[in-house]
Curated annotation (Swiss-Prot):
Endoribonuclease that initiates mRNA decay. The keyword Cell inner membrane does not apply. NCBIfam families: HDIG (TIGR00277), RNase_Y (TIGR03319). The chain crosses the membrane at residues 1-21. The gene is rny. This is Ribonuclease Y.
Amino acid sequence: MLWYIVAGAGGLLIGYLIASYQINQKLRKAKEDAQTIIEKAEKEANEIKKKAIIEGREEVHRLREEFEKERSRREEELRAFEERILKREELLTRKEENLEKREHQIEELKANLEEKMREVEEKEKRIDEELKRLAGMTVEEARELILEEARQRYEHDLAKLYKEMKEQVEEEVEKEAKKVIAFAVQRYAPDYVGEITVSTVSLPSDDMKGRIIGREGRNIRTFEKITGVDLIIDDTPEVVVLSCFNPLRREIARITLEKLVADGRIHPARIEEMYEKAKQEVEKAIKEAGQEATFKAGVMGLHPELVKLLGKLKYRTSYGQNVLNHSIEVALLAGYMASELGLNADKARRGGLLHDIGKAVDQELEGSHTTIGAELARRYGEKEDIINMILSHHGEEEPMTPEAVLVAAADALSAARPGARRESLENYIKRLMKLEEIAKSFKYVEKAYAIQAGREIRVIVEPDKVDDALAEKLAYDISKKIEEELEYPGVLKVVVIREKRSVAYAK
């Protein structure tokens, strides 16, 4: 019996343990399943969250782009609207300015009309007063009045007669002047070669070029530094070229190089030595050139320093014309014209020879060559009438004597002589174009032509709007503007042409 009880209790205990084990297993599995479900749910929640964030960012980006596009469109519309407003304001401003101009013109017309009305009223009053006065005049008073009116009426005819007589006298004077100038030119016919800005030096062989250049170019650098002249060595056989706008420096450099080539020893110290010798030779040549110039011009008794300065003019040019030859030419021409007119030929030659003496040192001193020349002449004992010739040949002073006028005329004649002076083609063309532009800038000018190598400008005007008096004034105004705005050698002639053509046909 007890055994059955124990067996039953044991069976119950075993059954309880088995049931408890099974329950624990189910609980553990349920927990694991619950954890798995939680982890899966969290994972899905994270993925949904990330997706939502990405979609949100994309939506924000899309909205931002749409906003930027809309903002740009609005700004463009606003800019276009502002431009339309500005254009409208400019249009209104122009209209306002035009309106003000029209109002100003109307005011001027109104003022002119009122002025005319006042003049008419004054004339009416004068006529009324004149009629009242005439009613009580004597015969003699009426006669005087008629004569006064006749004088006023024919005053224009008298002025025209005066003009014709003046033109006739000027024509006779011009003919006589041309005879004197032609006589002087016939007596003086110089041979002249245009000056250039380069000199050539012949070499015994092309090997000498390397010696002139020197090691690493030291000889040529020293030569150019000392002389101030460009030494050009090219492929031309047995020749080198010296280039410089200053003829004096170029001549000293030429003699220096010839001495170096003849000696054969070329190095910096030798270059300096030969340069000093060349300077001494040129100084001697300058003195001889001055003495020869005084002899050719027939001028005696000049101060030695003036003779030396004259020699320096041999190495100066003006528009390609040698200044010393030009001075001799002016002296002879002035002397010939003075002799023809019965004036002092010696004084004219002296003034003509010294008229450009200032150009010998105008690169070293401040001032115009005429002012410098007058100061030099005064310093070395020349008389005041000679000094006046120097100052007056370019108009800085009024000429005091007839000989001073002849010196100025001879200077212009020498400069204007064909072939005496030259310019480069480019400067020549620019000067002619500028000359025609100046003439065409005046009112009533139809055409303008520069002729005679730019020494004459012919201006064709509108005949219906320009009378003889206005034509003379126009020629004067054009000549003054040319003097102010244009540089040119010699004298430039301005001719105003007024041509009126009337055509009729006989049938």
